[in-house]
Amino acid sequence: NGVQKDFEASVKWYTLAADSGNEWAQNKLANCYYYGDGVEQDEQKAVEYFTKAANVGNKNSMNRLGDCFYYGRGANQDYALAFEWYSKAAEAGHHIAKFNVGNCYYNGYGVDQDFAKAVEWYQQAAEQNIEGAFNKLGDCYSNGYGVDQDFETAMSWYLKAAEKGN
């Protein structure tokens, strides 16, 4: 758009808005700290701001907070908390969180392994064009995980993934 990005100025304004309770700014500021855009990278501070925004309903922060707990970035790795935040984000309609909930069920991370539930969540993510869900559904149908084994259906999911470049 012809405008040069000034992350340091952005951080200044995000901080003012975030500290006054603006959940959108809290999420943006958290991302700045998470990636080190305009500030020194500080994943713990990112978790702090993701938590503030998530607690008032920001579904992007809910999903990102799930990532922080899943991967142990800025917080101790805790699959149960990751699953909890992914689930909240997914229930709020976050498309990637639906895929993440599916992965938790598929792998048994933070929740009992349940391939049928994984398939349900992968299907919801696939309906929103999450490419990874196409692949995972292909795997589920190919191996009979949570569904009857069906190589034709598996191949159709793998083809959808390939068409998306996955």
Regions found by a protein language model. Give the residues of each.
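Short helix-capping/linker turns of helical repeat alpha-solenoids
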Residues: 1, 19-23, 35-37, 42, ...
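Low-complexity/repetitive intrinsically disordered segments
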Residues: 1-5, 9-12, 16, 159-166
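Hydrophobic face of amphipathic alpha-helices that form TPR/SEL1-like repeat modules
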Residues: 28-35, 64-71, 100-107, 134-143
